[in-house]
Amino acid sequence: IDKFSKSLIISNIEVLLNYCMRFYERQFITREEMNNDVLVRFEQLLDEYMDSGKASLYGIPTVKYFANKICLSPNYLGDLVKSETGKTAQEFIQLKMINVAKNALIDPNLNTKQIAEMLGFQHPQHFMRFFKKQVGCTPKEYRNQNVATA
């Protein structure tokens, strides 16, 4: 092998990988209607998971769970959600969890432990840490701010 063979092989492999990436990305563009159907199905499954109490039984929802339900790989579902919404599938799930938590925190009859269990957290401290990281305040602070303004 001469001194140019290695660089030629590398260049050809790079071209092949670029073609692979091109075709992979193109499928998200050319299948827009089907992608929207998958996204709607993902949202429906996520709503059903949170509303049915499955989170308290099975834990925090995962991308893998929903990908299996939709018959896609977790990576493909993640890429599809990212291309359609700009958010990763995990961020999408977390956003839904935060919205459910915010609605639950407005109800004075639910304490933080109950809300944490409802969302699938095994420990209220994990929920409080998650909530503060996502929202910027603790669940108690959020509740106090929103009860005061209601």
Tell what function each PLM region has.
Residues 77, 126-127, 131:
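Short hydrophobic/aromatic patch on the recognition helix
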Residues 10, 32-70, 91-110:
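A short, Lys/Arg-enriched amphipathic alpha-helix from helix-turn-helix/homeodomain DNA-binding modules
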Residues 64, 75, 111-114, 124-125:
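Residues within helix-turn-helix
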Residues 129-150:
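…primarily DNA-binding HTH/wHTH and HhH modules…
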Residues 1-15, 19-20:
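Amphipathic alpha-helical segments enriched in hydrophobic/aromatic residues interleaved with Lys/Arg
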Residues 69, 118-119, 134:
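Residues within the alpha-helical elements of helix-turn-helix
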Residues 83-122, 144-150:
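Terminal helix-turn-helix DNA-binding modules in bacterial transcription factors
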